[in-house]
Structures are given as C-alpha cells and as structure tokens.
Regions:
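N-terminal "arm"/small-domain region of PLP-dependent enzymes with the aminotransferase-like
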Residues: 1-49, 55-58, 356
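Conserved N-terminal alpha-helix of the aminotransferase class I/II PLP-enzyme fold
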Residues: 30-79, 83-84, 100-107
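Conserved PLP-enzyme active-site core in the AAT-like
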Residues: 9, 69-268, 273, 284
Length: 383
C-alpha cells in the first residue's frame, strides 16, 4: 500500500469481532482470565490494551519499524528511551534541543550519572570529535526546535554504526509522511504525537518506534515497568487524527512556504529560520532526506519591535504552547518551550528574546498573513 492508504488501513484495521470499521475503544483496566496463565492475550491495560496496540502497530507500519509504543506524552516517550542508558553513559545532543528534553536530561537523568555532550549536530566532524568511550548514543532533532537546523540523519547513522552507538531521532516536526529516519539508518524514532500526528490539539501523547527485536523487547519492558502508557480513549483519538495526516501536512507545507516568503523581506524582521529557503544551510540535506519542509518557522524581530506587543496584536493566530494543530500557534521560545535551557546557551545558539516560533496552521493562508502583518505593525515600539 502507498503511505496515504497505510494511514487509514495500517496497523489493526477495524474490528473483526463486530465488523466495525474503526477500532473500538477498549475502556478497561483488566481482563477476565480463562485459567492460571491462560488468557486471550491481555491481562492488564498497563501491559497491553487492544486500542493502544492498534495504534502501536499503525505507527510501526508508518515508520517501517519493528515495533511501536504509545506513551502518555512526548516526554514520557523520551524518558522511556533515555531509560535505556546506565550510570556513566553519555549522550550527544544538539545545541538547540527542545527544552523539555534538555530539562529531563539535566535535572533528572544527571542525578543517575547519565550525562550529555552538547554539539552542533549539523557539523559531522564535531560529532566525531565528541565521541569517547562513555558515549552510547547520538540524539538528533531535525529540523531542530526552534532554530530549524538540519542534521544529515544518514551520515549520523553511519557514524553511530561505526562506533557501536544508537541513533535516536525526534521526528516530531516532520512526521513519517515527510521523513522516515529508520529508513535512513536510525535505530529509534520518537514523536510527540500531541503535535502533527494528533493534529487537533485535543490530546497529549508520545510514540516510539524501533528498528530491531532487541530494542523492541527493551522498550516494552520499560513501558510496562514505568507505566507511562497512553489511555484507550487517547489512543483512539490519535488513530483518528493520523488518518488525515497526509492532507493536513500538505496544507501545512504549502501555507508555511507562503508565510515564510511573506516574512522574508519584512522590515520588522531581522532573520527568518525556514529550511525551505534555498539559502538555508541545511536546504540540500533537507531536500535529500525529506519530501517537504514542514509547518514550522521561527523569526527574530528587529530592534525597535516588542515581541510582547506582537503577541498581544495576534487575532487568528493563538499565542500559546505546542504546535502541529490545525490552528496556527505562536510562542516565545526563550520563556516558554526553551525556558529550561540556561541563558548562556540560549544566547550562544540564537534563542534570543526577540525570537518567535510559529506553527502555521491550515486556515486560509491569506488570513494568517494578514494577522501577522497587523501584529508586526502593532509590535513597533512607540509606533
């Protein structure tokens, strides 16, 4: 089947028992046992649930992996993956990593002597120079959040394999519709499914897909042991959201390209971060490893413009956390998504106070552009 059909018919399609077209919501915590050690495949919903299992098989199909796992949030998924490591291990991470991922590494896993090395993962030599006997994995976001840096997944995976390391890719911004990290050589893919996969800002979920049986067994053990599983109802909502992923992502892509072109030469804006510009340093890599440029843009306001006033002037675009919904969302990374990252690191990589991150929705693109134009004009200090 082609990808668009797998979105609708992949995983467990419908219900054989009743003939229902959609997978039912198995809203149960426990299951009747036939006898000692004898059951119909389920014992307790933390360990396994038919609705969640349908979702897990679906995301494994979409990412072309060996096993999929559904968690109660993107951070629960990330935490499960980081739980693969032990005291003394180090992980190479990008220098503008999502703030929540940095926080869990810096404030929680560091307590267990699991460390990290911050590098510019777009620079392959810098990655190589930071590999030593303690490094166990290279963690990649591409595009990065929020500066849209592009890392060559295939080349990073080659480095990992030659050093017996894991390659972990957060594929939230791209989704498997645009980019398939496992096919490019990654070992583990993570999604905050709250975002584009769910697509409607009505659920919180995380997904993990792995490329081999050993990792499948390990992640399943961690999932069951730590218990951060996705509920049956949210699993159902996510399956439903995924069905329309292709049509939504096509609209996100086209709208975002138009918005980026609008922002590019505005006098109020100092810089636009968008991997779909040919002058973007990662454009050729992005064009090679993905079939689109996504629905995210970040931009820096010029001096003389107040980001606080800009947010106040927005009307159609919502000022708020998150991304990837049908509605356009704007946020302030320095105080919101990346507030957990130390000020010095934020300044060094470019997460400055005047940086705004925009998740372009699927509204009429002219309405989005007009809203941005009003907000940009309204953000002028004493103007």
């Amino acid at each position: 089947m082609n990808f668009e059909s797998v979105l609708i018919h992949g995983g467990i399609d419908g219900d054989d028992f009743t003939g229902a077209v959609n997978v039912p919501i198995y809203q149960t915590s426990t299951y009747k046992q036939i006898g000692i050690g004898i059951n119909k495949g389920y014992e307790y919903s933390r360990t396994g649930n038919p609705t969640r299992e349908a979702l897990e098989k679906l995301i494994a199909d979409l990412e072309q992996g060996v096993g999929g796992f559904a968690f109660s949030s993107g951070m629960a998924a990330i935490t499960a993956v980081l739980s693969l490591f032990k005291s003394g291990d180090n992980i190479i991470i990008p220098d503008n990593l999502y703030g929540g991922t940095f926080r869990v590494l810096d404030k929680i896993f560091k307590n267990f002597n699991i460390g990290y090395k911050i590098v510019n993962t777009t620079d392959l030599q810098q990655i190589k120079d930071n590999i030593d006997d303690t490094v166990r994995a290279i963690y990649v976001e591409t595009p990065t959040n929020p500066l849209m840096d592009i890392t060559d997944i295939e080349e990073v995976a080659k480095i990992s394999k030659s050093n017996n390391l894991l390659t972990i890719v957060d594929n939230t911004f791209m989704t498997p519709y645009l980019q398939k990290p496992l096919i490019l050589g990654a070992d583990i893919v993570i999604h905050s499914a709250t975002k584009y996969l769910g697509g409607h800002s009505d659920l919180v979920a995380g997904l993990v897909v792995v490329n081999n049986e050993e990792l499948k067994e390990k992640i399943h053990f961690i999932q069951n042991s730590t218990g951060g599983v996705l509920s049956p109802f949210d699993s159902f909502l996510l399956i439903r959201g995924i069905k329309t992923l292709a049509v939504r992502m096509d609209r996100h892509n086209s709208n975002t390209k138009a918005v980026a072109e609008f922002l590019k030469d505005r006098p109020e804006i100092k810089k636009v971060y968008y991997p779909g510009f040919e002058e973007h340093p990662g454009y050729s890599t992005q064009s090679k490893q993905a079939k689109g440029y996504g629905g995210m843009i970040s931009f820096v306001l010029n001096e003389g413009y107040d980001y606080k006033e800009f947010f106040k002037e927005l009307s159609i675009i919502t000022f708020g956390e998150s991304l990837g919904g049908v509605e356009s969302l704007a946020c302030h990374p320095a105080t919101m998504t990346h507030g957990a990252i130390p000020y010095e690191i934020r300044q060094k990589v470019g997460i400055v106070d005047n940086l705004i991150r925009l998740s372009v929705g699927i509204e009429n693109v002219q309405d989005i552009i007009e809203d941005l134009e009003r907000a940009l004009k309204g953000g002028k200090i004493n103007g």
